[in-house]
Structures are given as structure tokens and as C-alpha cells.
């Protein structure tokens, strides 16, 4: 049972972690790396239903992420309504069409060639769920008073990492989608002025036939410096 104490007028509880010897830790972290390294961005989803409880637990995991001053500056909007998904697809494809046919510089489009992406986003309707993460630039307390958030962008980024790991752990697949601009999402989902769309994540089972680019991740030496 956790111990409790008061520090400068604020409640604290004791914190302990299960201890593993170094050999067990090596096995655990190697297993987790191997498992996470199997994760791939997917654009081909099955429309097979996913139990709501699975999505709820995935979101709870994401919301366990650390955040600036523990303000938890996020809202996870879950869309399963076919009508709303269709609306989102129509508006997203308008923006993506403009991006692919005018906004994007040639170098960007060249970098996307190995991924073979285009402005058509059928996965926004096929995936059983869209999880749309909104970032709160400020918030309100229970009395309705405006309150600050801190490092909201970084906090939401960390939460999205937790979210993607939880999706993969559940046996589902996902895609990180960022139509730009994303203001239409606030309108469709009737979000308050303090929330701004941060990321669109279609979630579901992988389609029976799914192809992903044969690309490689950078090596440890390429992504780390040791001092």
C-alpha cells in the first residue's frame, strides 16, 4: 500500500517500481524494441469493428503521458460516425489536393515518392475510428476561470507517442495524418476556441491485403550521440 505525506501543504504518495536485475532488464527492453520495431504506418484498413473498450483503454494510456505542470492539455475526439468521417474526408481531401497540386515544394513531393502517397485519403472513412487529438492552448478550471497550460505542444507530442504505442500493443494499426490547415476539424467537431487540432489518427485492423514501403529506420549510431 502506498504511503502518504504532506509536503508544503500538498499531498504526496510514495512511489516504488518493481526491481529487475540487469539481465532481465536487457531481455525486457530488447523484446520491447523488437515488438515496437514491427510497427508500421498503415494506409490500408479493414472496416472490421473494433470494440469501444479497446479504444477507451488506448486513450487512457495516452492520457497517462507526462505533461507540463500536469495540465494534461489534450482532448481525444473519437469519431466512428460514418457521416462525420465522410465530412472529415471531404474537407481533408480539399486541403490535401491543394497541397499536392500547389502548396508543396518539389523537394517535399520528391521525398514522398518512396511512400507513394497522394491527396486521396480513403482511410479516413474505412478505418472504424478516427482519433483526433486537440491541443489546449489554455484551459478552464471547474469554476470556469481561464487557466494556463505549459509546453502544450511537447505534451501532446508525448501523449501521441503513448497513443501509437498503445494502438500497436493492442494489435491494431494506425496512421498519423496532418492535413494542413486543420481548422475545419474544429468546425466539424464543434471544439472550443482554446482547442486546436494537433493530429488525426485513423485506427483499426490492417486490411487483408496491405503493402507498406520497403524502407529502413536509421541505425543507433545515426540517431544517438553518447557523452
Please provide the spans of the model-predicted regions.
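Short loop-to-beta-strand entry elements in the cores of soluble alpha/beta enzymes
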Residues: 69-80
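N-terminal accessory segments that position/regulate proteins before the catalytic core
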Residues: 1-42, 46-57, 87-90, 98, ...
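Glycine-rich phosphate/pyrophosphate-binding beta-alpha loops
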Residues: 63-69
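Glycine-rich, charged/polar anion/phosphate-binding loops
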Residues: 61-63, 114-119, 185-187, 210
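Small-aliphatic-rich amphipathic alpha-helix that forms the alpha element of a beta-alpha
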Residues: 58-63, 137-188
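Glycine/small-residue-rich phosphate/adenosyl-binding loop
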Residues: 5, 78-156
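C-terminal helix-cap and adjacent tail motif
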Residues: 2-24, 28, 196-227
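Short, electropositive alpha-helical surface patch
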Residues: 185-198
Amino acid at each position: 500500500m502506498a504511503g502518504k505525506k504532506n509536503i508544503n501543504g500538498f499531498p504526496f504518495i510514495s512511489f516504488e517500481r518493481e526491481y529487475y536485475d540487469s539481465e532481465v532488464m536487457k531481455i525486457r527492453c530488447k523484446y520491447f524494441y523488437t515488438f515496437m520495431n514491427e510497427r508500421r504506418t498503415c494506409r490500408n484498413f479493414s472496416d472490421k469493428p473494433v470494440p469501444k473498450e479497446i479504444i477507451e483503454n488506448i486513450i487512457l494510456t495516452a492520457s497517462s503521458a507526462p505533461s507540463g505542470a500536469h495540465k494534461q492539455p489534450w482532448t481525444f475526439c473519437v469519431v466512428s460516425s460514418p457521416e462525420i468521417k465522410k465530412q472529415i474526408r471531404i474537407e481533408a481531401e480539399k486541403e490535401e489536393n491543394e497541397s499536392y497540386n500547389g502548396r508543396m515544394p518539389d523537394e517535399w513531393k520528391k521525398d514522398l515518392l518512396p511512400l507513394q502517397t497522394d491527396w486521396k485519403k480513403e482511410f479516413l472513412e474505412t478505418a472504424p475510428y478516427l482519433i483526433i487529438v486537440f491541443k489546449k492552448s489554455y484551459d478552464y478550471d471547474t469554476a470556469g476561470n481561464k487557466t494556463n497550460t505549459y509546453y502544450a505542444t511537447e505534451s501532446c507530442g508525448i501523449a501521441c507517442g503513448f497513443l501509437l504505442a498503445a494502438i500497436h500493443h493492442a494489435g491494431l494499426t494506425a496512421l498519423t495524418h496532418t492535413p494542413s490547415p486543420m481548422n475545419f476539424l474544429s468546425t466539424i467537431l464543434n471544439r472550443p476556441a482554446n482547442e486546436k487540432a494537433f493530429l488525426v489518427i485513423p485506427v483499426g485492423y490492417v486490411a487483408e491485403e496491405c503493402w507498406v514501403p520497403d524502407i529502413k529506420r536509421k541505425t543507433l549510431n545515426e540517431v544517438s550521440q553518447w557523452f
